[in-house]
Amino acid sequence: MLDIKRIRTDFEAVAEKLATRGVDAAVLNEMKEIDAKRRNILVKVETLKAERNTVSAEIAQAKRNKENTDDKIAAMQNLSAEVKALDAELAEIDAKLTEFTTTLPNIPADSVPVGADEDDNVEVRRWGTPREFDFEPKAHWDLGEDLGILDWERGGKVTGARFLFYKGLGARLERAIYNFMLDEHGKEGYTEVITPYIVNHDSMFGTGQYPKFKEDTFELSDTNFVLIPTAEVPLTNYYRDEILDGKDLPIYFTAMSPSFRSEAGSAGRDTRGLIRLHQFHKVEMVKFAKPEESYEELEKMTANAENILQKLNLPYRVVALSTGDMGFSAAKTYDLEVWIPAQNNYREISSCSNTEDFQARRAQIRYRDEADGKVKLLHTLNGSGLAVGRTVAAILENYQNEDGSVTIPEALRPYMGGAEVIKP
């Protein structure tokens, strides 16, 4: 959520920044006018309350003097009626302001590339060289079916489109991947957490999914509960409405969880395979940091995600997302895109973002600065470390052999009982 004071005092700069995210200046102007009206009403209310207090004191004095108080009582009643009417108007204005501030995206950092969409993203670096095959590489969905480790047909029968069963070494591979990821992040100082997979609406508001993106989620009917779209939600809300000790920052959390997404608006995209599912496993990283340290922590988090891909020897690239392609809550985002041979393209496998104080303001996560003792909003960061299903897809395609088998990456073999190959 944006700071209304920043919009008020630095309006032109904020409007210019948000314009790069598709926010019409007219919306901000309307918000500014409503805020000005609110402040004027507040002044009137305080003035009227002061007058009412004065009249109340005069009435008390008049009664002590046994004087007639009818006129003063009538005046106080009129003042109270005016205050009540203005309070009602103020409540309506506050509701409008809340609607504005909760649906506007975060202000992009100065270092974010300006652009309309993913075509304006900027490649930062690459790692590894895509493998050259001396045979036609298969898509991971065909490999998975031929190996008998991925079953979309029965997933569709039991549930519906974009669901599947992992079987045998496929299930073992999925489990090996996320255990490996959690172990690697643990080495980097992340505390492993098992979170609830169901959260309440306040938690969804805190991280920015609600109210703007309700259609992308799975709500439990007639309840206050939602299936988590990512472990970012419970991990970030762990400290909601709390004040942390500044000396304890930064704090690192990691968790593996299922993620549930309706994929509204994704009809026709990635209809086959593991790239876009309604339910998938993901290892998440979340950080709580002081404002002056958060961008250094973003670079470290991105490196933590890269470490997984490097140890799995999967070629990838890092791109800085443009203002038009970033997520709602992000001030800056790096995407990691892994090489998918059958698509001859890089596809997103991780997204690492600094939300600055955007989520912290919504969730009221603060810290007490040990230097001056003041309570301040901290910065929150989140990143995939990594999407597990997409990692399975990348391994199947990059490690496939001409005979249809798939070599298991060396880093995962200790997690798979020493198995080296998945064979038909």
Swiss-Prot record:
Keywords on record: Aminoacyl-tRNA synthetase, ATP-binding, Cytoplasm, Ligase, Nucleotide-binding, Protein biosynthesis
Enzyme kind, highest EC tier: ligase
InterPro entries: aa-tRNA-synt_IIb, aa-tRNA-synth_II, aa-tRNA-synth_II/BPL/LPL, Ser-tRNA-ligase_type_1, Ser-tRNA-synth_1_N, SerRS_1_N_sf, SerRS_core, tRNA-bd_arm
Amino-acid positions noted as binding L-serine in the UniProt annotation, renumbered to this chain: T230, A231, E232, E284, S384
Pfam families associated with the record: Seryl_tRNA_N, tRNA-synt_2b
GO cellular component, one term: cytoplasm
Protein's GO biological process: selenocysteine biosynthetic process; seryl-tRNA aminoacylation
Binding residue positions for ATP: R261, S262, E263, E348, I349, S350, S351
Subcellular locations according to the entry: Cytoplasm
Assigned EC number: 6.1.1.11
Record CDD domains: SerRS_core
Reactions catalysed: tRNA(Ser) + L-serine + ATP = L-seryl-tRNA(Ser) + AMP + diphosphate + H(+); tRNA(Sec) + L-serine + ATP = L-seryl-tRNA(Sec) + AMP + diphosphate + H(+)
Any one GO molecular function term: serine-tRNA ligase activity
This protein's pathway: Aminoacyl-tRNA biosynthesis; selenocysteinyl-tRNA(Sec) biosynthesis; L-seryl-tRNA(Sec) from L-serine and tRNA(Sec): step 1/1
Superkingdom to which the source organism belongs: Bacteria
Quaternary data: Homodimer. The tRNA molecule binds across the dimer.
Primary role: Catalyzes the attachment of serine to tRNA(Ser). Is also able to aminoacylate tRNA(Sec) with serine, to form the misacylated tRNA L-seryl-tRNA(Sec), which will be further converted into selenocysteinyl-tRNA(Sec).
PANTHER family, per database record: SERINE--TRNA LIGASE, SERYL-TRNA SYNTHETASE
Similarity field: Belongs to the class-II aminoacyl-tRNA synthetase family. Type-1 seryl-tRNA synthetase subfamily.
Domain statement: Consists of two distinct domains, a catalytic core and a N-terminal extension that is involved in tRNA binding.
Listed NCBIfam families: serS (TIGR00414)
Protein name listed in UniProt: Serine--tRNA ligase
